Regions:
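Conserved N-terminal beta-strand and adjoining loop/helix that marks the start
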Residues: 1-20, 91
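Short secondary-structure boundary/capping segments
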Residues: 3, 12, 28, 82, ...
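Short connector loops at helix/strand junctions that flank enzyme active sites
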Residues: 6, 33-38, 83-87
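Conserved Nudix-box catalytic region and its N-terminal flanking loop in Nudix hydrolases
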Residues: 19-59
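A structural microfeature
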Residues: 22, 70-73
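A short local loop/turn or secondary-structure capping micro-motif enriched for an aromatic residue
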Residues: 29-32, 109-111, 131
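Unchanged
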Residues: 43-67, 75-127
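Charged phosphate-binding loop/patch that engages nucleotide di/tri-phosphates or the phosphate backbone
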Residues: 128-149
């Protein structure tokens, strides 16, 4: 069995008001149940990061990746399932009806577009020492500011 971390791709989807899209994971999910999260997931065998990013956006929202605005970061963590992961997160724009995402059935229960001053909501249902999704969001908003959006 490989000890290499699972590779993941994540999308911080930005709307025209400079808000970022988050979705709540279903309460029965093994990893981070009932927590807010960005769009993303594990790379399939043989898949490149950009391919996984495109696939995950469409699977989880029904939207189509239009362009990547920049990389937010590379995050190493161990999930509450005990598996090590390395996650590559990107700030992106998408094509589609941003008011009506098609959430992936059984995996997500609701969504929100958050402005930078609203990121504290991301701490809901998270372990007090976690803070990863909020840090990713804060770094995403910093990238947005750095590129003038």
């Amino acid at each position: 069995m490989s000890t290499d971390p699972l590779r993941c791709a994540g999308a911080l989807i930005v709307d025209h008001d400079g808000r970022i899209f988050f979705q709540r994971r279903s309460p029965h999910r093994r990893l981070f149940p009932n927590c807010w999260d960005i769009v993303g997931g594990h790379l399939e065998p043989g898949e490149e990061i950009d391919e996984a990013l495109r696939r995950e956006i469409t699977e989880e929202t029904g939207w189509i990746l239009s362009h990547v605005l920049g990389q937010v970061g590379e995050y190493h963590y161990v999930g509450d399932d005990g598996l090590a992961r390395i996650e590559y997160d990107f700030l992106v724009r998408v094509d589609g009806d941003l008011d009506h995402p098609t959430l992936e059935a059984g995996k997500h229960t609701e969504y929100r577009w958050l402005a930078e001053h609203e990121v504290t909501v991301l701490d809901e249902n998270r372990d007090v020492n976690d803070g990863l999704i909020r840090r990713i969001a804060e770094e995403g908003f910093a990238v947005l500011r750095s590129i003038g959006l």
